[in-house]
Amino acid sequence: MSERSRGRRFPLTLDAVVERKPAERQREKRISSGVNAVSLPTPARTASAERASSTPAPGPGPQRVAGVDAAVGAVAASAVQARTQAAHAAAGGMASDRARQALVARVQAAGVTDARVLAAIGRVPRHLFVDAGLASQAYEDAALPIGHQQTISKPSVVGRMIELLLRERPEPSAQAAQVPAQPLSRVLEIGTGCGYQAAVLSQVAGEVYSIERIRPLHEKAKANLRPLRVPNIRLHYGDGMLGLPKAAPFDAIIVAAAGLEVPQALLDQLAIGGRLIAPVATDRAGGPSQQLVLIERRGRFQFHSTALEGVFFVPLKSGTV
């Protein structure tokens, strides 16, 4: 690694991002004894300017370099495959390639078609993000409790939401389906939970910032992600409804809890040309109590909203606990 690479501010190893405590070191040691540390592949960094202001004016999203992310990601994926297989062999059948590919097939059957998203789900060892007593269900397409009245989302819902962020709008004259966009540069996740969705996002985005308001879950996500050595995730403890203005603007925002509306602070932090996906509560009689809403920022004061399918998420709350 060159001296220039060492001096880069991002990406950093997770150890450089979060505080390491003695108890967590012991937990990491116990995890490593059963599952070797796995380095997940990440897309190459794309060029973006430093944000000096804590409340920057919205502008175009970070620049993307076509082709670079795909090429580097393919090499990294090849290198990590051997490490993943070795780690999963030590962990037992529940973490085998067969189990992970069976999950990918279930997610695909549920309607997720983007090859990048399916590959990302297939690389992330979901059993590391659930309690040991639920590990046998980790590769089912099901939401599972993670404590504190929160859940790890269904993989098909995770895939669906990320897929929507990756898709481009079709041109008015286009006859075909939507065309996939270039990999995301900077993503904000509201609601880290156990860290699973952030891990999947890290496979399709250059930088992932994730906020959790529940301190024990924030600590759990740090512990879950540390053995995977994911270099492009930054975890934050705080009020997700306020977003993360110091790191804005984001070319994608994904919200993992349902509010009555999308907080204005999050809309303000979305780059022009960016997309936000969130579950929103509805009051329609006879309809779903929540539905996914896709918001596209088309100008400084111009937003376009599209209501999608019904979903069920935990409620979006303010403050920290």
From Swiss-Prot:
Its EC number is 2.1.1.77. GO terms for cellular component: cytoplasm. The keyword 4Fe-4S does not apply. Residues 41-56 have a biased composition (Low complexity). Its main location: cytoplasm. This is Protein-L-isoaspartate O-methyltransferase. Gene3D superfamilies: Vaccinia Virus protein VP39 (3.40.50.150). Belongs to the methyltransferase superfamily. L-isoaspartyl/D-aspartyl protein methyltransferase family. It is found in: Cytoplasm. Residues 21-31 have a biased composition (Basic and acidic residues). Residues 21-65 are annotated as: Disordered. GO terms for biological process: methylation; protein modification process; protein repair. It comes from Ralstonia nicotianae (strain ATCC BAA-1114 / GMI1000). It is an enzyme of class 2 (transferase).
